Curated annotation (Swiss-Prot):
This is Lipid-A-disaccharide synthase. GO terms for molecular function: lipid-A-disaccharide synthase activity; phospholipid binding. Pathway: Bacterial outer membrane biogenesis; LPS lipid A biosynthesis. NCBIfam families: lpxB. Its EC number is 2.4.1.182.
Amino acid sequence: MVDTVQAVLPADAGANGNKRGSIAMVAGEASGDLLASLLLEGLRARLGESVDYAGIGGHRMMAQGFVSHWPMETLSVNGYVEVLGSLREILATRREIREQLLARPPLCFIGVDAPDFNFGLEVPLRRAGIPVVHFVSPSIWAWRGGRIRTIARAVDHILCLFPFEPEIYAKAGIPATYVGHPLADVIPMVPDVAGARAKLALPEGKRIVAVLPGSRQSEVRNLGATFFAAMDRMHRMDGNLAFVLPVASAPLREIVAGLHAQYPDIDLTVVDGQSHLAMESADVVLLASGTATLEAALYKKPMVISYKVPWLTAQIMKRQGYLPYVGLPNILSGRFVVPELLQDDATPEALARETLLQLNDEGNIAFLRQHFTTMHETLKRDTAKLAAGVVVDLMRSRGVV
């Protein structure tokens, strides 16, 4: 962790050549890193090299010239109970970022997802006159709708990934723009299954099951054992299956290796990152609820969505939720189009059974391919360009660029 203001943001333009200043960004996990990297691409296209970018980000953001001064993993914690173990570090990080950004104000602050962390940072920054944009609306239409009052104090503009969201914010007087979902720009309309399998060196002649138990260690600890037991059952029910499992970090690879050792007969390929290739290669996907469910839909894949959290977290979420489903494909469809097995329903037997049903139902596979193609077309909007345009317009309206 950095100790000085000087280390967080670059010096002002007078001391840094032709630089106008810096845009500060905070992204909290792998999905936010991807979204932010595309926004950075759009900003760099609009602003050239006149602006620096710094804060918290991942490897995709850093590939766009972003400088991350705190580990993104600090924020990669989910759930009410689970976050308590990391709360002191999270709050200390947020306090340090706030103090340093207030001491050396950026041209703009962009919070990317991670709403519980970012809104607490955005409120004082906006109060200090720093333009604030939040990229990714929290799911206020699904649960914790009261957060919209905090959002009204936290942001000057919110960038929405789904077409129904701006109307919700308009009713609360919050400027919001639908920019489409950047994943719809990144993921091809027609997946190259054979190409993905070749790149991952997957076994030939077998049907492929992609398994994604999550990108956070807490998720993999909650779901990993159940998913591996389900994989073992599928392997014993159908010997023509091979599995591919992407891991987002070295610690996750260690957890997965320990689980695989318990089921050595499973034909499993573990890959570092490359979750998109894993899904593109698959005939069916078994995965944790989250952004990956939308990615699987954009790859036009049948899937089974699952999730497990500690009992207390589940009770809190249940009391604050409004919808009967948690997976993005179902939420965007307004109905169940793929099965969800959550909490006590997520047994190895049920997961194996539902995954094989999804794999073998040709009529349902054809329906999902068409349904998800229509969804893809709705979400494809050149997000990087639209989102960057909103940010630049806000900064120009404030006279900072």
